[in-house]
Amino acid sequence: DKAVTLKKIQKFSNEYKDRKCKLYVLHGTMKESELTGLYKHPKIKALINISHGEGFGLPVFEAAYNSLPVVASNWGGVTDFMNAPAKNKKGKMKKRPHFANVDYDVKPIQKEAVWEPVLVEDSMWCFPREVSYKKAIRSVYKSYGQHLSKAKKLAPQLVERLSEENQYKLFADHVYDGEDLKDVEYVFVSDMFANE
């Protein structure tokens, strides 16, 4: 996997001899502290995600959680956490993207991407528009302070709303309402469904 990936990146990068940026390949399992170190590194200014779609989008979440500006499409799993309340011009709170939003089209996945039963033939994907993502990246570069401010406003909301404790509670509340479980030390799953 690593050798194939490096070969593809080398071939791709050779097409751009006059590029001004370096390419670094991170491969393999990283510790949480190493990931956080990347997101907090002073030379890392944003996470760019122009994928076809994510489930939850863990790298995007981790970047946002660490107050790193994000460039992404407002589609797929990122909509669960990258849109947060903000005041509009009239002073009302409304959910707004807290990232550099990329325009996109939703189209059927390519035939070569079909992977039954995971990606079925009639699945749809997000296709970010090149002009839009270039514009979004440029915006983050030129107006970095504005994008960093949005990221810093979003991070504490993520920490509060998506903390482990809140997620455990949300999950447990969906599984069982807990009314009959007050002051009980042990609960057996079979007891939850005894009347069904």
Language model features by range: what are they?
Residues 73-74, 80, 102-104, 108-110:
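Conserved acidic donor-binding loop of glycosyltransferase catalytic domains
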Residues 2-38, 45:
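Nucleotide-activated donor-binding/catalytic signature segment of Leloir-type glycosyltransferases, i.e.
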Residues 69-72, 82-83, 89-95, 100-101:
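Short hydrophobic beta-strand element within catalytic cores of glycosyltransferases
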Residues 52:
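Aromatic "clamp/platform" in nucleotide-sugar-dependent glycosyltransferases that forms part
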Residues 63:
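Donor-sugar nucleotide-binding helix/loop cap in glycosyltransferases
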Residues 57-60:
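Short glycine/serine-rich donor-binding loops of glycosyltransferases
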Residues 43-45, 67, 74:
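A short alpha->beta transition loop at the rim of the catalytic pocket in nucleotide-sugar-dependent
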Residues 105-196:
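C-terminal amphipathic helix plus adjacent low-complexity
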